[in-house]
């Protein structure tokens, strides 16, 4: 994605975002949209009018993109990573470029909707379904751990390191267990811990837990011939803004496993 930003002094800056960085940007924009909806609910028409007025001015000042900027992208303007520093009414993005230069980009909440619409339009124009699929699969949960439960009493786990700012965009940790029909009856063979904002036991959560396997090579290999017949989930308690350690994730998951295992054996 080419993102062209016009500064207040009229000077323009160009940024190039490849798929993983674009996914991070969309994650940030999505989280701010939730804040904006809340603000609309609280402030009503006054805030709605402010949004409309601002967006009209924004559209009138959209900078022109030159053909050369698309066909000959500057490698040094390619963003390699984004770190979010959230504010009350704006997001400050700390950008690391390909040449290791660091810059900041401030996005006001009033600009969020227009930016999302612009990105959606660009994706629609390109028509790359694989990219759209990749981006949408990274929007509603973050992988933390996957576990092979066939190696009891030892736990064979895989960790997926995530940045704190990203984990903070989601509301709670979710423990998931996958139960399969085996020759010895129903058995829980694998599990996962993810962070999500999908309401517990909702259709959205159901969508998340069924897609975890696809995102994990470990689980995908385990369930290639053994599809889950039942999926169990539980919220792992955590304080807002505090990241859980390995033990704080896997110990509750194991306790949940023992509880469900006992129920299946009863």
Where is each model-derived feature located?
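Positively charged, low-complexity terminal tracts
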Residues: 1-266
